[in-house]
């Protein structure tokens, strides 16, 4: 089911009725809520119509409804919103992201041609990933919106790692092919370790209770794997083909001197390491989930003028139809329950002759009242009185089944109207009654997320347990918020533990050392805790799905830089002192770390303002903040810890 809110401005009473009639003519809209006298639907120069359809927001039927509403925009000042609107991601966002990427690479690369090679390689990987998504049953809007962008920012550092290694090997070896072989060989541990930590971090999302975790985890991990294959196949070929052009287009690029930082890190290794341990301990104990909200971020025009109803659907087995009246009676005692729509309260509602006559006239079904009375008398016979009641369905079915008896009273045009009404009733009935289950649509003035809302849901659940036999289900945004508020801590802890264990194992087998994965995982987890602290300080409320998703992405992606830094240090320590190794590690890794992190921070940070969907924008912004924190820890804390545990890091290996 979908609800569409339509707001039209500057209407007089006649035009309000015209719009109402035009909306009624749109196919697949079954109910329209509007009251010319109510402040609920009229405010200043704004008029609200609430449309209901049985189809989902991403169906062809809803797309056709949106086209019809777009046509009305030509004549009226009209805006509309869906309860769960899905729009295509503009190609301009992808182009904008690649433009930002190109600018950063042009500044940071040592050749004018290198950015083009990077973009071609990652572009091919993104196209393949998007194409293989068609093999999946369904891809969510959130995944579809950010998959390409995240694949771009998560895997660009692998390309930079390989090219930087190739450049280093070229200084010692004149043969291009030999240099590339050595570059692949020496960068392989860092790239494979980095990519697999990213992949397992993303695959951890599969353990989320919500389908979006599985969806996003599969698509992004698949994208990283495809990018990895392209970086070891496509990129080396491009580099070798355009080697001469790369060196002909050589240019100056920013070089960050980290020598003083290296000296500082070694000199104050005890203070920095101790400060880190204390900081981690404090953040672990004070971290909280008060920064989390379970209500989806929204940016709605109509809600600025009209407070939207909070709809909750109760799905129950048809065998409980006799008991459902008790649930309805219970709901009517709550002042914040505005309407209760079921089969019995809509198309299945019973009317006496006067009520039914009035209702049919309102629906432009012109059946003479004498006919209505005669049908009531025929059905009820001796028991007929003014309080006798029938449903519209019963009345119309009687006329259709006995139409030969009404030949003199009902002409062909009227019979056509009756048959049309019968079809509409059947369709409307399907909205409420299925083969096994029926629904109650409860419209309330409760907020989507509040203590009062959760209390209402809790009491309604207890009432259903007492009154209904068999299975029943609740559907709605508030229901999802209610369930997640009860399970979020468990969900967060589960995802954290799974992510840490998987990444720990990958780093363990990458370095064949127990101390290294312990340090690196601890460092990045500290970045996650600091991120939560920053969000708290800024008094932000983060959508719970954003936090769950971002934690896995941060743990899997930013540890790449720590792996790169550690790998360089261990390699250099074979022939150099601690101080020289640390200086050279900074010199060799800073360009890759700085370029890659800059891409991730700026692209996600800027695109967070571009996406129309606030939830997706929020994910981008949190990634940008989290990556910034993680990079600062890697550059200013990790070196001191590495120096402190130098002997264990360099020598403590085990055989795989």
Describe each model-derived feature in a short phrase:
Residues 23, 265, 331-332, 464:
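Hydrophobic C-terminal alpha-helix "anchor/cap" residues
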Residues 60-294, 458, 467-656:
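Membrane-embedded transmembrane helical bundles of large multi-pass transporters/channels
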Residues 15-111, 123, 397-505:
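Extracytoplasmic
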Residues 3, 11, 31, 260, ...:
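Juxtamembrane segments of multi-pass membrane proteins
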Residues 305-309, 335, 422, 430-436, ...:
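A structural signal for short secondary-structure junctions
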Residues 58, 65, 363-401, 504-508:
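Extended, charge-rich low-complexity interaction segments
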Residues 2-9, 45-55, 286-295, 310-317, ...:
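Short, hydrophobic beta-strand segments
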Residues 309-311, 337, 434-439, 550-552, ...:
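Active-site lining segments that contact anionic ligands and/or coordinate catalytic metals
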């Amino acid at each position: 089911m979908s609800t569409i809110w339509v707001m039209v401005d500057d209407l007089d009473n006649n035009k309000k009725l015209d719009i109402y009639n035009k909306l009624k003519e749109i196919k697949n809209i079954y109910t329209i809520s509007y009251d010319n006298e109510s402040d609920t639907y009229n405010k200043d120069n704004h008029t609200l119509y609430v449309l209901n359809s049985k189809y989902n927001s991403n169906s062809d039927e809803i797309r056709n409804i949106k086209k019809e509403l777009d046509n009305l925009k030509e004549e009226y000042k009209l805006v509309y919103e869906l309860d769960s609107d899905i729009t295509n991601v503009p190609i301009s966002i992808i182009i904008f992201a690649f433009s930002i990427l190109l600018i950063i690479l042009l500044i940071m690369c040592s050749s004018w041609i290198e950015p083009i090679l990077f973009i071609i390689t990652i572009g091919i990987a993104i196209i393949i990933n998007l194409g293989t998504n068609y093999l999946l049953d369904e891809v969510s809007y959130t995944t579809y919106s950010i998959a390409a962008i995240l694949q771009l920012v998560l895997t660009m550092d692998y390309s930079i790692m390989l090219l930087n290694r190739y450049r280093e090997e070229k200084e010692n070896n004149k043969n291009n092919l030999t240099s590339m072989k050595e570059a692949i060989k020496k960068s392989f541990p860092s790239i494979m370790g980095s990519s697999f930590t990213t992949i397992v971090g993303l695959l951890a999302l599969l353990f989320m209770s919500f389908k979006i975790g599985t969806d996003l985890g599969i698509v992004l991990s698949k994208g990283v794997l495809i990018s990895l294959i392209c970086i070891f196949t496509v990129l080396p070929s491009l580099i070798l083909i355009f080697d001469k052009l790369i060196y002909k287009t050589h240019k100056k690029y920013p070089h960050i001197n980290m020598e003083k930082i290296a000296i500082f890190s070694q000199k104050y290794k005890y203070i920095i390491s101790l400060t880190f341990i204390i900081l981690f301990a404090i953040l672990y104990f004070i971290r909280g989930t008060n920064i989390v909200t379970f209500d989806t971020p929204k940016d709605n025009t109509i809600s600025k003028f009209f407070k939207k109803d909070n709809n909750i659907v109760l799905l129950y087995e048809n065998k409980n139809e006799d008991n459902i009246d008790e649930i309805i009676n219970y709901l009517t005692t709550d002042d914040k329950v505005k309407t209760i729509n079921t089969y019995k309260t809509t198309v299945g509602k019973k009317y006496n002759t006067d009520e039914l006559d009035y209702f049919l006239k309102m629906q432009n079904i012109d059946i003479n009242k004498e006919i209505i009375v005669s049908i009531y008398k025929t059905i009820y016979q001796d028991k007929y009185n003014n309080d006798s009641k029938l449903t519209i369905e019963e009345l119309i079915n009687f006329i259709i089944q006995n139409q030969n008896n009404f030949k003199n009273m009902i002409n062909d045009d009227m019979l056509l109207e009756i048959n049309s009404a019968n079809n509409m009733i059947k369709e409307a009935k399907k909205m409420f009654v299925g083969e096994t289950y029926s629904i109650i649509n409860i419209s309330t003035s409760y907020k989507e997320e509040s203590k009062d809302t959760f209390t209402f849901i809790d009491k309604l659940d207890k009432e259903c347990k007492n009154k209904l036999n068999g299975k029943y289900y609740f559907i709605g945004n508030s229901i999802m918020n209610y369930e997640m508020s009860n399970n979020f801590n468990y969900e967060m802890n589960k995802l954290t533990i799974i992510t840490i264990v998987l990444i720990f194992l990958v780093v363990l087998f990458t370095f064949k050392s127990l101390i290294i994965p312990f340090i690196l995982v601890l460092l990045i987890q500290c970045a996650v805790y600091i991120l939560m602290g920053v969000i708290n300080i800024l008094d932000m409320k983060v959508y719970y799905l954003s936090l769950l998703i971002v934690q896995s992405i941060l743990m899997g992606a930013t540890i790449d830089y720590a792996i790169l830094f550690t790998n360089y240090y261990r390699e250099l320590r074979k022939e150099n002192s601690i101080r020289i190794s640390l200086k050279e590690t900074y010199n060799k890794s800073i360009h890759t770390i700085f370029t890659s992190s800059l891409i991730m921070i700026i692209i996600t940070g800027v695109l967070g303002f571009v996406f129309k969907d606030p939830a997706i924008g929020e994910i981008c912004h949190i990634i940008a903040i989290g990556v910034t924190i993680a990079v600062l820890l890697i550059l200013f804390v990790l070196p001191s810890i590495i120096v402190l545990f130098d002997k264990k890091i360099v020598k403590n290996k085990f055989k795989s």
